[in-house]
Amino acid sequence: MKAALVIMAAGMGSRYGGNKQVDGIGPNGEILMEYSIFAALRAGFTKVVFIIKPDMRDLMENMVGHHLAARKTADGENVEVCYAYQDFSSVPDFYTVPSDRVKPFGTVHALLCAREFVHAPFVVINADDYYGVDAFKTIYAELSKLAESGEGTMVGYDLCNTVSEHGTVTRGVCHVNEQGMLDRVGETFHLKPCDDGKIRDIQENGDGPVYAPETPVSMNFW
């Protein structure tokens, strides 16, 4: 089955202080998204779509695009590589973008910018998160089942495996019904493991709501 990996890499990186999507971290200078790409190719994905800012094109091609285009898929075919620009030209006519808006909108805006490059089952991920090899195998298998129905799926993670002792994180807390289906995702902004061993949302204060370690959360892997 042909399937596309759509990578959202147009984030401004303002909290990080630069373009964390293209900072090398591996032994040979690999950037974080390369680990996702290689895991996806091994799982069976055949196409990679980068959603970027226009001024990132040369940087992305030099760091990832050129050698990725030379790689083969699991079936021995060339990997198809595309670049979609996240700008306001894709915003629907019924919405007026504020004149002083510079920063791109979120996930839906990113996907709108990539729609002309996606004509097969696809998944969308963040450029600056690590998802693990097994996650790509799992979601590729699910895509194979869902391809005809047009339905969607998501890879979820236990909250305890996605928080950091070095600061707060934002996670999409998943609310799942008795049938194991996702009802909704609530974005929660200041999750942190506290000194008493409990994970809390400390947005309002240090004694905020407690979340169970196994609470399913979204890392934006749809």
Language-model-derived ranges and their functions:
Residues G18-N19:
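Conserved catalytic-core motifs of eukaryotic protein kinase domains, centered on the activation segment
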Residues A9-R15:
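Conserved adenylation A10 loop of the ANL superfamily
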Residues V133-W222:
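Conserved core of the sugar-phosphate nucleotidyltransferase
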Residues M8-A9, C82-A84, V124-N126, M154-D158:
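Short beta-strand segments
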Residues D87-S89, D128, D158, G180:
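Short, flexible active-site-adjacent loop segments at beta-strand->alpha-helix junctions, enriched
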Residues M1-A4, G13, P27-V124, Y131-T138, ...:
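Conserved N-terminal catalytic core of the sugar/cofactor nucleotidyltransferase
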Residues V6-M8, R101, E151:
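Short, flexible coil/turn micro-motifs enriched in small/turn-prone residues
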